[in-house]
Amino acid sequence: MGGEGFTILHASDFQLDVPLGGLRWIPESIEAEVLGAPEVAAQRVFDFALQHQVDLLALTGNLLCPTNSSARSLSFLEEQFTRMHEHGIPVVWATGSIDPLENWPTSMTWPESTIRFDRGSVGRRVMTLGGIDVEVLGCGGDAAGNIHPEWFDGLSRGERQLVIGGGTVDSFKRLDASDLWVLGGRNYAEH
């Protein structure tokens, strides 16, 4: 049908717990801006989603390392997910190599509209995006940040499917599970 569609905003690898790197030294006059750059960049993603009223915010891995992060970074992320919920924008988050679900503090609360997919297995959820029912297949990558096409073997193929994954795919020749794949990348610091 003509005119059907929905909008997905995709972001990955916020790494809120990692300071901006690659600089030999930071001039004192911009030190605060450099130190706050990861949070400012992430804030802009959430602001963009609200400004453009996207149908879905897809986050694919490595948002932050929950065991090494400050309370400020954890609180920031929780606040942003709540903002999305309050404005009717669901967040689908597929974990990456540094942010598996088992490492998150149990005290953190997640809005109902936040769907989290962990690494190593495929989860399924039907969502209505822009008035269209879409089956979302989600998974985080393995510990090395890879998503293996065989994880999707045996899953039924629907007309409107979307894969959201927190990692990279080892072989693009076998991507039969869906026509649309939204994937995170590997952390370049790991290479």
PLM feature spans:
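N-terminal active-site segment of His-dependent metallophosphoesterases
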Residues: 1-75
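His/Asp/Glu-rich metal-coordinating catalytic cores
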Residues: 56, 67-191
